A protein has these predicted regions:
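Feature marks short, highly hydrophobic, charge-poor N-terminal signal-anchor/signal peptide-like helices
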Residues: 1-15
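Short hydrophobic helical membrane-anchoring segments positioned at the boundary
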Residues: 177, 181-261
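Short, amphipathic alpha-helical interface elements at domain boundaries
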Residues: 23-199, 254-257
Length: 261
C-alpha cells in the first residue's frame, strides 16, 4: 500500500475512533442526566433576615440624600427608603448582600476563605483575590437565605467536561446565581434588567407581609462588626467581591444614559 493511502487510512481511523468516543461519552452523560434524582425544591421564604433589616431600616446603614437634590432623570438609580430620602440602589443591594452573608457566617452556617488569583489584565476592576464559600446545611428561609441555597447548589454542581462537583462555591458565582433566582422568583412581569433593583423589589415584597423587629438593627450591625473584627481582610474581600459582581452584572444590562433615556 502506498504511504499516502496508508496515512489517509490511519487518520480516518483516528477520526472515527474519536467521534465514537465522543458519542459514547455523550450518551453516558445523557443517561446519567436523565436518571439523576431531582433536587429537593427549596421552600419559599418565611422569616426575616439581615437583608430585610437593612432595607427596612436603610437610614441606619447607609447615607441618604434628599430627593430634591437628585434630578428626576437620575432618580432611577436610587431607591426611596423614607419620605423624601434616597439611597443608591447598587449600594443598598451591596449592603443587603453583605449583611446577609455576615449574619449567616455569625450563625456558623457559612464559612469563607480567601485565596489569591491572577486578575484579568483586560479588566481594570478585576480582583486579585477570590473568596470561597462553604455551606454545611440549607440556610434559613429568609429571602436571601433561600436564594443563596439555590445559588450554592448551582455553583457547586458538576459541569460536563468543565469541572467536577465542588465542595466550595466561588463567591462571585454564588451571588450571581442567587440574584438569578431572585429574578426567577419575581417572574418576568415584575423583574427588571437591573439585578440590584430586582433584589430590592424582591425583599420589599416580602416585607409587605413580614416586618423585622426594631431590635434587629443592633443584631445585624453586631454581625457586621464581628466579621470585621474577626478578619478585616476577609470582610473587605467580601465587600469588594459583591461590588464587583454587581458591576459585572450591570455591564450586561442596558444603561438608560446610553439609550438616551
Amino acid at each position: 500500500m502506498p504511504p499516502g493511502i496508508a496515512l489517509v487510512v490511519f487518520w480516518l481511523l483516528v477520526v472515527t475512533l474519536g467521534i465514537a468516543a465522543v458519542l459514547v461519552l455523550g450518551y453516558r452523560s445523557l443517561v446519567w442526566w436523565l436518571n439523576a434524582p431531582d433536587e429537593p425544591v427549596v421552600p419559599l421564604p418565611n422569616q426575616s433576615g439581615a437583608e430585610c433589616v437593612v432595607l427596612h431600616f436603610a437610614e441606619q446603614f447607609l447615607d441618604t440624600v434628599p430627593k430634591s437634590e437628585i434630578p428626576e432623570w437620575r432618580r432611577y438609580r436610587y431607591t426611596e427608603v423614607a419620605e423624601g430620602k434616597l439611597v443608591l440602589t447598587d449600594e443598598l443591594a451591596e449592603m443587603m448582600l453583605l449583611a446577609s452573608l455576615a449574619e449567616l457566617w455569625q450563625q456558623g452556617l457559612l464559612s469563607f476563605r480567601v485565596v489569591a488569583k491572577d486578575p484579568d489584565p483586560f479588566d481594570p476592576h478585576s480582583l486579585d483575590k477570590e473568596v470561597l464559600v462553604s455551606m454545611g446545611q440549607m440556610l434559613p428561609l429568609t429571602p436571601l437565605g433561600r436564594c443563596f441555597t439555590v445559588g450554592y447548589r448551582i455553583a457547586t454542581r458538576p459541569v460536563w467536561l468543565l469541572r467536577e462537583k465542588r465542595n466550595e462555591a466561588v463567591l462571585e458565582d454564588l451571588v450571581e446565581f442567587a440574584l438569578r433566582e431572585v429574578r426567577r422568583s419575581l417572574g418576568w412581569r415584575k423583574a427588571k434588567r437591573n439585578s440590584a433593583e430586582n433584589l430590592v423589589r424582591y425583599v420589599k415584597e416580602f416585607l409587605a407581609t413580614t416586618q423585622p423587629p426594631s431590635g434587629a438593627v443592633a443584631n445585624v450591625k453586631g454581625a457586621l462588626e464581628a466579621l470585621r473584627a474577626h478578619d478585616e481582610a476577609l470582610a473587605e474581600a467580601l465587600q469588594a467581591t459583591i461590588r464587583y459582581t454587581l458591576l459585572a452584572l450591570r455591564r450586561l444590562e442596558p444603561d438608560r444614559d446610553e439609550l438616551g433615556l
